[in-house]
Amino acid sequence: MVSASNVEAPRRQAILAAALTCFLRSGVTGTTIDAIHRESGASVGSIYHFFGSKEGVAAELYLDTLRDYFDTYLAALRSSRSSRAGIQGSVRAHLDWVVTHEARAKYLFHCQEFEVIEESLPAIARLREQFYHQANAWLAPHVEHGRIKSLSPRLCQALWMGPSIEYARLWLARSGDRFNILDAQTALARAAWDSVKGRAAR
C-alpha cells in the first residue's frame, strides 16, 4: 500500500523545483504563489498546505538545498582515509556539487532576501550547528595528532574552504566571462591543504 508520505514527497519536491525556477527568474519578492502554481501545476491549495506561504516555500527550498550541500561535504570527509584526502576531497566535492546543482547553488549562495532569511533563521542556525559539530568531529583527531594545524575550527574552515567558495560565487555570477570551474579543482584542493596541513601531515 502506498502511504500518504510516499505520495506527498514527490509533490513537495516538484513544487520546490518549480519555485526555484520562479525565484531565480523573478526573485522571491517578485514571485507570487500563482506563479509557482502555474510553473508546478500544483494547486494553490496544495502549495499552502505544504508550505503555508510563499516565504515558507522559499525557506524550505533554502533549507533543503543547504542540507543537501552539507550532506555532500560531510560524506567527502567521512569517506577519506587521510587528513589530506579529507581536505582535498571536500574541496572537490564542493565544486562538483556547485556544477551539478548550478541552479540550487545560485539560490543558496546569492539568495539574501530578508523574507527567506527571517523565515528560516532558527532552522538555518540549527542546521549549521549540526554541520559544524560533525565537521569538527572529523577535524579534531587530525589536529590532535598534528596532521592539521591547531587553529580555531572556524578559522581552519575559512582557510580550507574560503577560496573555493569565493571561486564558486564568481562562477555562478558569470555572464560573458565563461570559464570551467572544474579546471581549478586541483589548484584549489592543493591550496586548501597547504593552508592547513600540520607538521605531522600525511
Walk through the language-model features, giving the residues of each:
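N-terminal intrinsically disordered/low-complexity leader segments
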Residues: 1-10, 21, 200-202
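Helix-turn-helix
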Residues: 2-3, 14, 22-56, 60
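Generic hydrophobic, amphipathic alpha-helix propensity
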Residues: 11-19, 36, 61-65, 69, ...
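Short helix-capping/turn signature of helix-turn-helix
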Residues: 51, 110-116, 162
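Hydrophobic alpha-helical connector segments
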Residues: 60, 74-103, 156-160, 182-185
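Amphipathic alpha-helical packing segments from all-alpha helical-bundle domains
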Residues: 67-71, 118-145, 154-158
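Helix-loop "lid/cap" segments that line or gate small-molecule binding pockets
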Residues: 76, 92-99, 109-114, 192-195
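Hydrophobic/aromatic-rich alpha-helical bundle segments in the mid-to-C-terminal region
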Residues: 105-110, 121, 143-191, 199-202
